[in-house]
From Swiss-Prot:
Its EC number is 2.7.1.148. It catalyses: 4-CDP-2-C-methyl-D-erythritol + ATP = 4-CDP-2-C-methyl-D-erythritol 2-phosphate + ADP + H(+). Keywords: ATP-binding, Isoprene biosynthesis, Kinase, Nucleotide-binding, Transferase. This is 4-diphosphocytidyl-2-C-methyl-D-erythritol kinase. It is an enzyme of class 2 (transferase). Pathway: Isoprenoid biosynthesis; isopentenyl diphosphate biosynthesis via DXP pathway; isopentenyl diphosphate from 1-deoxy-D-xylulose 5-phosphate: step 3/6. SUPFAM superfamilies: GHMP Kinase, C-terminal domain, Ribosomal protein S5 domain 2-like.
Length: 278
């Protein structure tokens, strides 16, 4: 048996800078990962199959077009018994399905002893699959296929992720965008020696999908406000197309205390503290 961890993908920034003739949107995004996520296990078998377990399994029925199965078919036609242990909320802006697909590729490449595909080769599975396969902090551009490593390592920091239990499909959020030709991030990203410096930079940047997502799901604004109100929160923002928001913290103790406080006040929300992975 082989196993791979599917970390949550976090868009610290997400600038929508254009739209191609085929409809795909051009992005400029600073992407990191949180040390919380799903797990994909692969065991030898004659046929390809998938079982879904875990606390979020009920929200993701097994279907033939599941990204884990699609990723497996991309890698080859061999058999395997796949198990997806689902912890991340579905359709929540933190790349759960894309991270699962990337983890399936990693687990199956080990099981079948075949090379991993290049990140750009898996773009057809979804715009976030290449960056999830990369698995480290990068600047993501194009439609998700241009991945540029950061010049300097990110400072150590913590995230609190919060989702109000609302599923936000991505297409309506993009459709509701007021503009699709927004300015990108600076050409040269500065180094960030501290989490405070990173937060100060992020405050000058944006998630262009946040306003249309809030218009579709006002709970997102309340989630962001709940994070921002916590002691030690340096910045609160929506990730991806929502509805998950993140709070950036310098210290583990403050992040865990914030997650506990939000969870107590909003018992129906999904809340998780996690180390930021660069």
């Amino acid at each position: 048996m082989t196993e791979a961890f599917a970390r949550a993908k976090i868009n610290l920034t997400l600038h929508v800078t254009g739209q191609r003739p085929d409809g795909y949107h051009l992005l400029d995004s600073l992407v990191v990962f949180a040390d919380v996520g799903d797990r994909v296990r692969a065991e030898p078998a004659e046929a390809l199959s998938l079982a879904i377990t875990g606390p979020q399994a009920a929200n993701l029925p097994v279907a033939d077009d599941n990204l884990v199965l699609r990723a497996a078919r991309t890698l080859g036609g061999q058999g395997a018994r796949l198990t997806l242990e689902k912890h991340l909320p579905v359709a929540s802006g933190i790349g759960g399905g894309s991270a699962d697909a990337a983890a399936a590729l990693v687990a199956l490449a080990r099981l079948w002893q075949v090379p991993l595909p290049e990140p750009a080769a898996v773009l057809k599975l979804g715009a976030d699959v290449p960056v999830c396969l990369e698995g480290r902090a990068v600047r993501m551009a194009g439609v998700g296929e241009i991945l540029t490593p950061l010049a300097a390592p990110l400072p150590e920091g913590w995230l609190v992720l919060a989702n109000p239990g609302v599923s936000v499909p991505t297409p309506p959020v993009f459709k509701a965008l007021a503009r699709r030709d927004n300015p990108p991030m600076p050409d040269d990203l500065p180094g960030w020696p501290t989490v405070e410096a990173l937060a100060a930079f992020l405050a000058t940047q944006r998630n262009d999908l946040e306003p249309p997502a809030i218009a579709l799901a006002p709970e997102i604004a309340r989630t962001r406000a709940a994070l921002a109100a916590q002691r030690g929160c340096l910045l609160a923002r929506m990730s991806g197309s929502g509805a998950t928001c993140f709070g950036l913290f310098a210290a583990e103790e403050a992040a865990r205390a914030a997650a506990e406080a939000i969870g107590a006040e909003h018992p129906g929300w999904w809340v998780a503290p996690a180390r930021m992975v660069g």
